[in-house]
């Protein structure tokens, strides 16, 4: 596989940006939204999408307000990977009045058990969870049915050769899903899936920090030691470059997650580049990858939608990420939580991603803000309940020392 230098990556990005901007039209609020074909699906998606993950911690009122703001700008694609029945209900209530205007990317294999998210390939549970998704989203079909979260080639091979993929095909044949997709963090899995011809859409984590790293082959080996970073590391990882090219060449629509790296790229102190990026710069980086169709950004309030949609009218200077990439270190994200939630389920019922989020918010301040402490104390289970079993660490795609962070959070918050 070909290896690119930073200079080549930046030059390619500049050319690609000019090409797609010249070809995109738009409507929506103030006529600013841009749209792209979603691979060969026949669907056109807004380049700014709605990753609804953060609605889980928000009220129905906020969820509806964010959804209406998205609609006002012409955002037309939403991702719902979450299995929590409460967030599914909130999202369903918000999108139901304008269901036909939304392209729903829903996940099969994301289930709810004993009050927690759990990923599974057990078909009876998957079928029950999918029926729940349809009911709570108040719809009789999902536009893009995603095979939820596969990060090893071995698991992909098992799924593609077994009853799970057959179930996905049955859903498509019945019209309950219109297209089959896959979500993964591992470019090797993405490459295998795209080459198989079995998927039409790929949801993949794309940002400048992740793109310089080698692929994940299995969670426990992610970033295991400095030997993962050789002297040649510095441009985009060749596996990722190949994946993006394959998506473009074969018409597999690339829907982007983690464009902001969980918000860490906005903070100079926490960013691996030691320089803060803006939402516009992160979005521009993602959308200049070959095959990229939409960035599924996360929002906590309507103003976050405004910040993302500003991309559509941003100047070249506002979109410029090259000056940051030119100063990028060789490696970036070893041991840093992006609040993705893949560590679940916790044997003690702790919402690990939320505890980590609140902990990071708290330690960034001279003292714990009252609002952060209030949110923490309102959680059903606290970091002090951690038993250090470390089962969560085996599921973490970023090799975070979760047990140690739980101890630190318990000490900081007092429970």
Feature-to-residue mapping (PLM):
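C-terminal segment of N-terminal export signals and the immediately downstream linker at the start
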Residues: 23-48, 52
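Active-site groove signature of glycoside hydrolases
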Residues: 135-155
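Conserved, mostly hydrophobic/aromatic
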Residues: 38, 50, 78, 104, ...
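Local cysteine-cluster metal-coordination motifs and their immediate loop/turn environment
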Residues: 335-349, 383-398
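Acidic (Asp/Glu)-rich catalytic clusters
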Residues: 40-42, 92-100, 135-138, 194-197
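Beta/alpha (TIM)-barrel catalytic core signal, keyed to glycine-rich beta->alpha loops juxtaposed to Asp/Glu
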Residues: 150-354, 364-378, 404
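N-terminal secretory signal peptides and thylakoid transit peptides that target proteins
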Residues: 1-16
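Short, acidic/polar
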Residues: 58-69, 122-136, 186-192, 279-283
């Amino acid at each position: 596989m070909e290896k690119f230098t930073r200079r080549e990556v930046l030059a390619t990005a500049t050319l690609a940006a000019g090409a797609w901007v010249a070809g995109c039209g738009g409507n929506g609020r103030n006529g600013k939204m841009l749209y792209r074909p979603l691979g060969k699906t026949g669907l056109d998606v807004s380049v700014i999408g709605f990753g609804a993950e953060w609605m889980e911690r928000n009220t129905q009122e906020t969820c509806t307000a964010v959804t209406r703001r998205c609609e006002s700008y012409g955002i037309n694609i939403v991702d719902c990977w979450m299995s929590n029945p409460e967030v599914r209900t909130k999202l369903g209530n918000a999108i139901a009045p304008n269901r036909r205007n939304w392209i729903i990317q829903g996940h099969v294999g994301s289930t709810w058990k004993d009050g927690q998210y759990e990923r599974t390939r057990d078909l009876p549970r998957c079928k029950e969870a999918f029926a729940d998704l349809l009911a709570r989203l108040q719809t009789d079909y999902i536009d893009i049915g995603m095979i939820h979260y596969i990060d090893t080639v071995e698991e992909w091979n098992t799924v593609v050769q077994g009853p799970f993929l057959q179930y996905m095909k049955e859903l498509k044949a019945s019209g309950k899903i219109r297209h089959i997709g896959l979500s993964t963090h591992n470019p090797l899995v993405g490459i295998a899936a795209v080459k198989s011809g079995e998927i039409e859409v790929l949801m993949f984590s794309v940002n400048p920090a992740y793109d310089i790293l080698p692929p994940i082959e299995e969670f426990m080996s992610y970033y295991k030691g400095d030997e993962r970073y050789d002297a040649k590391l510095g441009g985009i990882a060749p596996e990722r470059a190949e994946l993006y090219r394959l998506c473009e060449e074969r018409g597999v629509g690339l829907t982007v997650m983690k464009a902001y790296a969980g918000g860490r790229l906005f903070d100079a102190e926490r960013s691996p580049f030691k320089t803060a990026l803006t939402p516009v710069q992160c979005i521009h980086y993602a959308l200049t990858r070959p095959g990229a169709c939409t960035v599924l950004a996360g929002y906590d309030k309507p103003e976050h939608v405004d910040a993302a949609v500003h991309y559509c009218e941003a100047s070249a200077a506002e979109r410029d990420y090259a000056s940051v990439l030119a100063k990028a270190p060789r490696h970036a994200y070893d041991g840093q939580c992006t609040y993705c939630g893949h560590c679940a389920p916790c044997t003690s019922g702790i919402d690990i991603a939320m505890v980590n989020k609140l902990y990071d918010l708290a330690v960034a301040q001279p003292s714990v803000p009252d609002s952060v402490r209030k949110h923490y104390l309102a959680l059903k289970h606290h970091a002090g309940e951690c038993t250090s079993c470390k089962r969560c660490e085996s599921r973490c795609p970023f090799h975070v020392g979760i047990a140690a962070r739980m101890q630190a959070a318990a000490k900081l918050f007092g429970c």
